[in-house]
From Swiss-Prot:
Subunit organization: Part of the Tic complex.
Biased composition (Low complexity): 586-688
Impact when changing residue 1384 to K: In strain: cv. Baekmibaekdadagi
Protein name listed in UniProt: Protein TIC 214
Entry keyword NADP: no
Length: 1879
């Protein structure tokens, strides 16, 4: 026995060793890999089933094995697994491959080359089969994802010591498993093919073709399965399209991605465990489970870009923004599905993903440090690559080469610190006592107290300004940060408190009122803390996020929010109580108090968590209407420690209160409102807003509302807009009302067995009861049976109640799911109420009482109508809360309505019945019936007649009983009398007919004896008759026996008579049949005779005609079907053409009318607008200029205009502010209520905010009383405008911005943005000056540098934006270098004169015909004052159309020129013809037409004529040049594009007026004295000057023309023919050089003749020989007299346009939208409004100012303030002792709370509130020497910069502070403490 047991024990141990051995475990896991079945097996099965030939089957098998082998290898080789398991393989490889294969398998013989045996491997189809099976194995993770398998394999492999043995054994197991699988599949397929014929013969005999159809349908089945697989994959891939981001974070999305990550790690043992285990377990920890496995919360890793910075230039490795490994194996995919949730404490969105840390060495400041870096998989991949690279690299890398950048950076920092120290020492040497506090550099701390007297700061551990990011250890046992002093004393009691209670104890309001100092644990407590957490929470958005429900229902704590950010469930706010009278305060109750409202209302105390643990628990008792059951769940947000008890006054008598089992949560809320959310039974959850607070006056109404949620699944789950929702498992919807369930978790849901689990126990109980009843042996007490019966009844009642509630919910949800369902239901309810009240019920009363009258019962008209009047219809809310009788609920059409019937009508007879209870109320249904609850089941509609029917039934029962008695009594008597009477009648009849019957009988016998043949024929009939006779005889014999003997003879005679009648009938029938046979035979004979080969019968003709009709109809149907598509297409095209033509004409007419009326017929308004002294501020100008565009686009709502110009630049800020429709006035409060000088640049801005924005309440009383002053000396000067004016390429119209996408603009701006003010790369304190060098002032427009560095642009922009007080136009300083200040090129208009109108070449060229007069008026007075306008603005056009009308004419002339360098063809000449003196006016009145012409021919225009005005747009600083005259005349071919041809070949969008109107080489001709003489001169001087101007405009060529025309009058001896030829020659030759116009006419035939008229009209302007020229033109048919209007003063120019004589159409640009061009026109809007702009034209000195000595930098500061009376530069801003970089950082920190004037530029260490003077006080003392508007600029800077430049700070955060991971400083963390002060 011992031996046997020993042997058995050894065997068991041996078996266990074998099972646990590496080989067996490897075989097991290798065998398991066979069962990771996916769609890749489809190709193998398809090849075995469908492919013919062994080659394809073998190729499919080999491809399958090869692919599986690669997948097996990928389990153990991490880089291969990452390459195959990354998401890009799905998007880039899998989906296109599947789709291509799906379309490839559909067409037949796609790659069919024919059967070739020799070159079978060259056949492409075989290779495709191999590749299909090979590639598709890589997408194998489908049904059984390999993630779990891979983890199991990894665990087992790392547990084994001999890993190679494990790998080889698993490979053997894999091979065995696949061989077995393939063999089994092959055997199954062979068996199916062999037994296919037997199965088809046995079971498919009826359909012979079914087998062939199945064989042919295999290919489509596979393709369908493949397509389904593709669709399944399509829903699982990451979208490569970038997500839509919110408007606030769109600019900084790229920079924030790498910085805003939430890092959470829970460490249980130690932090610094070895990294080798993590490297070895990299495939286990970080490997994505599978390619198509379900997406889980992948570990969040840090993938920040490692940037190599050399000399502050950013360079990336190998030219990529990210390392190559991260690009290839990006675990975040294109858009990582991060789901942002709302953080309750900070009230901002914070990512809370669990992250997997990986520690790796990285160099920082030249030292190796352990940091959080790449995922383990990528790190191992880099290690493998480094090993491979090291094998091929021969040279060794020196580590000193990599240390050079770090060394240079450290040295640079050292130099900066040395300079800072030097500046501090120099300031100390000055000996000023006020500078002592400024010399010391202090660190900014966060103050936690709002009181100015207190000084409480956060500890250094928790202060982000001192300790960097929020990264520390947090104890998880208790919420120590919120415990007060009383709770700290009871540490022994509360130290082991449950975590849930600790979470509830936290008061979330503390993070908004002030952050309290966290609790410091004792030494004894620290021993018990063994679980720590490292956290770093960085909010995503810097502003408070609100939910959709908060925005819709104004639950935003009084803040004005434009749009919500967090999505909420679909809900409806229903007002349940709106009492206009005064309502008592909400009663508070303690746990001992019990409300005494009604017997049905109960109050159960519910403990409410409060902010202090010492407060006593309170209770909440809320009485609600009876329609809300007691099982409601409430959440009562309250900011106080007392609970609310709200009573709702309603007409209902029952009310329920919230039970103790309700779950109550108290989120943070303000003291102004408290909300209670209550859920209606199992369907909706409601929340009640009690808008009644202590601060509100008592007279205001109290309103209570409930927010009702639909019982539907919510897939959004409070997802923030702009963030991609989490990829979750696909949810199938197979029911109308269903939750979010996944198909992969079907085993969790017992669909089939759930019913069995419910009903089987019940069946077992019933069986037990039956058995108990039948089995008498087992005694059972009666009490137990009674209890079980009562329990069963209660269960059944509860089940029925639950079923009814579910039905009600489904009905309610069904109405909500229908579109406009509540609207339809509400209208139906109202109509049904009206029909019921006034039609149905009166008719029912009348009908019921009439029936009572008919039934001989008394009517009840009076009582019924009395009850009818008692019935009342009350409108209720959706939740059945009644309102007033004539009051409808708010938004009842959308939210829903209920109609409650009080005292429903019943007939009077019903009230007598005792069984039926009387109902006080019910609800009306859509069908007009009654129901007990809203959405309840309808009751019987015949309830009105129920009592009458009962009475009728009783009456009928009584009458039936009476009838039965009467029938039994009298019916017997009736039968007896009937028998007696009939007997007497029969006897009399027999006696009266005896004799004739006997006689007839004899005659019949004789007849039969004479005709025996007939007797034989009717033999059978005789037999029948005899049988009947016998029967009759038997009956008659019986009768005869009973009768007397005298009656026997009579009965015999009657029998014979009956027999005779039968025979007669038979005979007649036989005759009729024979006759019918004969007639039929005759008809057949007639038809045979009439048949002939040439003739057809009538029936045949009918049949043939029907056939022909069918054929014709069939042909016509086919033809109609064939032509119907073209017919419909043609029909629809015609309809669309008609519609679009009408729309285009309408829009064209509307556009023309609006443009004409606004531009030309508002003379007085335009004149007043121009004469008014510079009233166009930025806001009003933009509003006016964009009015035409907005008015035209109101109708076309589908037109999307990109008016958000925030993408332009950081400097384009004020324009965006002026465009905002809703301005948060709370941010403007410190600006409006400022006690010092006004913070507004102009009074118009203040008036604009008062009138338009509505800032009456915010404005200070002193500001309201200020009057509007003259704006001659004030201007809209802003530092960023000065910078923009130097960048003419940003001058852009906003209409052009709509055609430019933001992304394209960003790409273009990075490349093309040029800074004109900077010719040298300076450091920080610089001002770009244009070099003068004794050259023309506008040459620098074309001599600017073309490329600027990104760093330099950021530097200049930030420095100009922050430190613009260094500029000359600022409120304190002048320019750094005073150079050439004598020349001013300002935008100064003469206020008493009209503005010079500006014209842009991309706008319509207007020509107007006013009677016979052509007049163009323009004002060139004060021309030199408006010389430097940057462009021609068409929206400033002004035309004074008076009696004769004004015309603006464009004339484009091409003259002979000689080409030079840098010149282009196509000169554009702009001629302005104006009214100058009275002589010209007299000529106009005499109807003499004039036209000023300018020819640029060198011969007629000598160069020594200095008074000539020469126009050259493109080469402003060069000499006059002649241009080549083109022989071609493009106006005859394309007159509409003539101006585009001449004017837009080159784009001179920014040409000053000076360069247009003067030759720059001869610009000394016209001096300022000649142009300003009008102010001090008289009319004679004015006329002479004007005449000289006109003479200078008129060229010599014009004089020659006048001489020629005059000579024609003098020469009388010349013949008429010669004069005609000369005149015609002049018309032909001179017309091409002096006539250019553009005109469109609606009728093309009329336009030709009108074109001829205008040719002659334009030529005859200012001609002396006008009559001869006109006669010659008429003779040559060049004039059409039909279009000449008679001279009359009645016709006006407006009437001409209205009658359609001229249709002026704008010419659209056929010009490509250039980014610079568009930007230049947009910012040009603000440039026009500038009144003062001084341009210093000298290059700045080269080099960095602060790299030189400190004395030089001080000298620069002295230069800046040399024009001031005193130099107190260092007193103004205390932080100026720092370096520029440190100063910028310090200013950014200060400006975040600059709205409070007491906190601006305040020192932290020496600040006691009294000693140190603020900047405002210093500036008030120096206000005597400063201009007012410069102080206003300072205030505007303090307003604009902190409030609207946060996003710009975030953009430049990295550059300013040299931070990659935001460890030193981050702008985005400051909003974590929104109400804290920075001191």
């Amino acid at each position: 026995m011992i031996l046997k047991s020993f042997i058995l024990g050894n065997l068991v141990s041996l078996c266990m060793k074998i099972i646990n051995s590496v080989v067996v475990v490897g075989l097991y896991y290798g065998f398991l890999t066979t069962f990771s079945i996916g769609p890749s097996y489809l190709f193998l099965l398809r090849a075995w089933l469908m492919e013919e030939g062994t080659e394809k089957k073998v190729s499919a098998t080999t491809g399958f094995i090869t692919g599986q082998l690669m997948m097996f290898i990928s389990i153990y080789y991490a880089p291969l697994h990452l390459a195959l398991g990354r998401p890009y393989t799905i998007t880039v490889l899998a989906l296109p491959y599947l789709l291509f294969h799906f379309f490839w398998t559909n067409p037949k013989h796609f790659f069919y080359y024919g059967s070739t045996t020799r070159n079978s491997m060259r056949n492409l189809s075989i290779q495709c089969v191999f590749l299909n099976n090979l590639i598709f194995q890589l997408f194998n993770h489908f049904i059984l994802p390999s993630s779990m398998l891979v983890r199991l394999v990894n665990i087992s492999m790392f547990r084994c010591n001999n890993k190679m043995l494990f790998v080889t054994s698993s490979f053997v197991g894999w091979l065995i498993g696949h061989i077995l699988f393939m063999k089994s599949v092959g055997l199954i397929l062979v068996w199916i093919q062999q037994n296919n014929s037997i199965i088809s013969k046995k079971y498919i005999r009826s359909n012979k073709y079914l087998v062939s159809e199945l064989r042919n349908s295999i290919a489509p089945i596979f393709s369908i399965i493949l397509f389904i697989t593709w669709v399944y994959y399509l829903g699982r891939i990451p979208s490569p399209i970038p997500l839509k981001e919110t408007s606030k974070t769109s600019e900084t999305a790229e920079t924030e991605e790498s910085e805003e990550e939430t890092d959470v790690e829970i460490e249980t043992t130690s932090e610094t465990k070895g990294t080798k285990q993590e490297q070895e377990g990299s495939t286990e920890e970080d490997t994505s489970p599978s390619l198509f496995s379900e997406e889980k919360e992948d570990p969040d890793k840090i993938d920040e870009t490692e940037e190599i910075r050399i000399d502050k230039k950013e360079k990336y490795l190998f030219g990529f923004e990210k390392p190559l490994g991260i690009i290839l194996f990006d675990y975040k995919r294109w858009n990582r599905p991060f789901r942002y949730i709302k953080n309750d404490k900070f009230d901002n969105a914070v990512r809370k993903e669990m992250s997997q840390y990986f520690f790796y060495t990285c160099q920082s400041d030249g030292k190796d440090r352990i940091v959080f870096t790449y995922p383990p998989s990528v790190a191992t991949f880099f290690e493998l690559i480094e090993k491979k690279i090291s094998l091929f690299s021969t040279e060794k890398l020196f580590y000193d080469e990599f240390d050079n950048p770090w060394k240079s950076l450290n040295e640079q920092k050292k130099r900066i610190l040395n300079k800072i120290v030097i500046t501090r020492i120099l300031l100390l040497d000055k000996g000023s006592p006020t500078l002592v506090g400024d010399v010391l550099q202090k660190r900014t701390q966060l103050c936690i107290c709002n009181d100015e007297t207190k000084k409480e700061y956060l500890p250094k551990i928790y202060d982000p300004f001192l300790s960097g990011p929020y990264r520390r250890r947090i104890n998880l046992l208790l919420g120590f940060s919120m415990l007060n002093e009383t709770s700290r004393k009871n540490d022994s009691e509360n130290i082991w408190t449950n975590k849930i209670h600790a979470i509830i104890r936290n008061n979330n309001n503390g993070f908004f009122d002030g952050v309290t100092i966290p609790y410091k644990a004792n030494a004894s407590d620290q021993n018990s803390i063994d679980l720590t957490e490292i956290s770093k929470k960085v909010p995503r958005w810097s502003y408070k996020l609100i939910k959709e429900i908060e925005q819709v229902y104004d639950i935003t704590d009084g803040e004005l929010v434009l749009d919500y950010q967090i999505r909420s469930r679909k809900c409806k706010r229903v007002v349940i109580l709106s009492d206009l009278n005064k309502i008592k305060k909400i009663s508070t109750s303690t746990p001992t108090s019990t409300p005494t409202s009604t017997p049905t209302s109960t109050s159960t105390p519910t403990s409410t968590p409060t902010s202090t643990p010492t407060s006593t628990p309170t209770s909440t008792s809320t009485s609600t209407p009876a329609s809300i059951p007691a099982s409601t769940s409430t959440s009562i947000p309250a900011s106080t420690s007392t609970s609310t008890s709200t009573s709702i006054p309603a007409s209902t008598s029952t009310s329920t209160s919230i039970p103790a089992s309700t779950s109550t949560s108290i989120p943070a809320s303000t003291s102004t409102s408290t909300s209670t959310s209550t859920s209606i039974p199992a369907s909706t959850s409601t929340s009640t807003n009690e808008i009644k607070s202590k601060d509100e006056p008592k007279d205001e109404p109290m309103e209570q509302a409930i927010i009702r949620y639909a019982k539907q699944w919510d897939f959004r789950r409070e997802i923030i807009k702009g963030s991609m929702r989490a990829q979750r498992r696909k949810m199938g919807i197979y029911q109308l009302f269903q939750g979010a369930n996944s198909y992969l978790f079907l085993d969790r849901h017992n669909f089939f067995f759930s019913d069995f689990c419910i009903y089987i126990p019940r069946l077992m109980e019933k069986l037990d009861r039956l058995r108990i009843r039948t089995n008498t042996e087992l005694p059972i007490s009666n009490n137990g049976e009674e209890k079980t019966r009562e329990d069963l009844k209660n269960e059944k009642n509860q089940e029925s109640i639950n079923l009814k509630e579910e039905k009600h919910i489904q009905i309610a949800e069904l109405w909500e799911s229908i579109r406009f369902g509540q609207l339809v239901r509400g209208s139906l309810l109202i109509t049904q109420a009206f029909l019921r009240k006034y039609i149905i019920l009166p008719s029912v009363i009348i009908a019921a009482n009439l029936t009572r009258i008919l039934l001989l019962s008394p009517p009840h008209f009076f009582e019924d109508f009395k009850n009818w009047k008692k019935e009342i219809y009350v409108k209720c809310t959706y939740n059945a809360i009644p309102l007033a009788e004539n009051e409808f609920p708010q938004n009842w059409l959308t939210d829903g309505i209920q109609i409650k019937i009080l005292f429903p009508f019943r007939l009077q007879s019903w009230h007598r019945s005792k069984k039926i209870e009387k109902k006080d109320f019910c609800f009306l249904t859509v069908f007009g019936t009654e129901t007990e609850q809203p959405f309840g089941s309808a009751e019987n509609p015949f309830l009105f007649f129920k009592s009458d029917l009962i009475e009728l039934r009783e009456f009928i029962k009584k009458k039936k009983q009476q009838l039965k008695k009467w029938r039994t009594k009298y019916f017997r008597i009736f039968l007896r009398l009937r028998k007696k009477v009939f007997r007497k009648i029969n006897i009399a009849k027999e006696k009266w007919v005896i004799k004739p019957i006997l006689f007839i009988k004899k005659r019949i016998r004789e007849f039969w004896q004479r005709n025996p043949i007939l007797l034989l024929q009717l033999k059978e009939i005789y037999k029948l008759t005899e049988a009947k006779k016998e029967n009759n005889s038997i009956i008659s014999n019986g009768m005869i026996q009973s009768s007397s003997g005298s009656i026997d003879s009579i009965i015999l005679s009657l029998r014979e008579r009956k027999m005779k009648e039968l025979t007669d009938r038979i005979n007649t029938m036989l005759k009729i049949i024979e006759k019918m046979k004969k007639d039929r035979q005759k008809e057949l004979l007639n038809t045979k005779i009439n048949i002939s080969p040439n003739k057809m019968s009538y029936y045949d003709k009918i049949f043939e005609s029907q056939k022909n009709i069918l054929k014709i109809l069939k042909k016509r149907n086919v033809r109609f079907i064939r032509k119907s598509y073209k017919f419909l297409k043609f029909f629809v095209q015609n309809i669309y053409i008609d519609i679009f033509q009408g729309i285009i004409n309408m829009s064209r007419i509307n556009g023309q009318d609006s443009k004409i009326t606004k531009s030309f017929f508002n003379n007085e308004a335009n004149q007043e607008r121009i004469d008014k002294p510079n009233q166009s501020i930025i806001i009003s100008t933009i509003k006016k200029l964009l009015s035409n565009i907005t008015n035209k686009n109101v109708k076309n709502q589908n037109l999307k205009m990109f008016w958000d110009v925030s993408y332009l630049s950081q400097a384009y800020l004020f324009y965006k502010l002026s465009q905002t429709k809703i301005i948060n006035l709370s941010k403007l409060r410190p600006v409006f209520q400022y006690h010092g000088t006004s913070r507004f640049l102009k009074n118009e801005i203040q008036d604009y905010f008062v009138e338009v924005v509505g800032a009456h309440e915010i404005l200070h009383s002193d500001l309201k009383q200020k009057k509007q002053k003259n704006l001659e000396n004030s201007g809209m000067i802003n530092p960023w405008k000065n910078w923009l004016r130097g960048h003419y390429n940003f001058d852009l119209y906003p209409i052009r911005w709509s055609k430019l996408l933001s992304q394209k603009w960003r790409n273009r701006v990075k490349q093309d943005r040029k800074n004109k003010d900077f010719n040298q790369c300076d450091s920080y304190e610089k001002k770009g000056l244009i070099d003068y060098k004794k050259q023309n002032p506008f040459e620098t427009h074309y001599s600017l540098p073309t490329k600027k560095k990104k760093k330099y642009i950021y530097d200049s922009l930030s420095y100009k934006s922050i430190n613009y007080e260094d500029n000359k136009d600022s409120y304190i300083y002048e320019l750094p270098v005073q150079v050439k200040n004598n020349q001013e090129s300002c935008y100064k208009y003469n206020k008493d004169k009209c503005k010079f109108f500006d014209i842009l070449t991309d706008l319509p060229i207007d020509k107007y015909l006013v009677k016979n007069n052509y007049l163009v008026k323009a004002n060139i007075r004060d021309l030199e004052k408006t010389m430097d306008r940057k462009y021609f603005d068409w929206r400033m056009l002004h035309f004074s159309i008076k009696n004769k009308g004004d015309i603006r004419v464009w004339r484009h002339n091409e003259s002979d020129t000689n080409s030079k360098k840098n010149t282009q063809n196509g000169v554009k000449n702009f001629e302005l013809i104006q009214k100058i003196n009275k002589k010209i006016i007299k000529k106009i009145k005499k109807k003499e037409l004039f036209y000023l012409t300018i020819n640029q021919d060198k011969k007629s225009n000598p160069s020594n004529n200095k008074k000539q005005i020469f126009f050259d747009w493109m080469r402003m600083s060069e000499k006059k040049i002649s241009r080549y005259r083109s022989n071609s005349n493009p106006k005859w071919f394309f007159p509409k594009f003539l101006i585009l041809y001449n004017a837009y070949k080159i784009k001179p969008w920014m040409i000053p007026i000076k360069s247009l109107l003067f030759d720059l080489n001869e610009n000394e001709i016209f001096s300022k004295k000649k142009l300003i003489e009008k102010k001090n001169g008289n009319k004679a001087k004015k006329e002479s000057v004007a005449k000289e101007g006109v003479d200078s405009v008129l060229s010599n060529h014009t004089k020659n023309l006048q001489k020629d025309s005059a000579g024609a009058d003098v020469k009388k001896g010349i013949k008429k023919k010669q004069s005609k030829k000369k005149i015609e020659g002049k018309l032909g030759v001179l017309r091409t050089g002096h006539f250019r116009f553009q005109l469109n006419w609606p009728n093309p035939e009329i336009s030709k003749s009108l074109f001829m008229n205008l040719n002659g009209f334009s030529f005859m302007l200012r001609r002396l020989d006008l009559k001869k020229l006109s006669l010659a033109a008429i003779r040559n048919n060049e004039f059409s007299l039909e279009f000449l209007l008679p001279p009359s003063d009645d016709i006006t120019f407006h009437e001409l346009l209205e009658k359609g004589i001229f249709i002026i159409e704008p010419v659209r640009l056929s010009l490509k939208n250039d980014g610079k061009f568009i930007m230049s026109q947009t910012i040009g809007i603000s440039l026009v409004q500038k009144n003062k702009y001084q341009l210093n034209q000298r290059y700045q000195e080269k080099g960095y100012p602060y790299k030189r000595s400190f004395a030089e930098s001080i000298a620069i500061h002295q230069k800046r303030t040399e024009n001031r009376t005193s130099n107190h530069y260092d007193l103004l801003v205390p932080e100026n002792i720092l370096s520029p970089r440190g100063r910028r950082e310090f200013r950014i920190l200060i400006c975040f709370n600059s709205g409070n004037k007491n906190d601006i530029h305040r020192n932290t260490a020496f600040d006691d509130g009294n000693k140190v003077k603020t900047d405002d006080q210093v500036l008030d003392k120096r206000s005597k020497h400063l201009d007012r508007y410069q102080n206003q600029l300072k205030n505007l800077k303090l307003f604009l910069w902190p409030n609207y430049r946060l996003e710009d700070l975030a953009c430049m955060n990295r550059y300013w502070f040299d931070t990659n991971n935001s460890s030193r400083f981050s702008m985005l963390r400051i909003h974590m403490y929104p109400q804290l002060k920075i001191r």
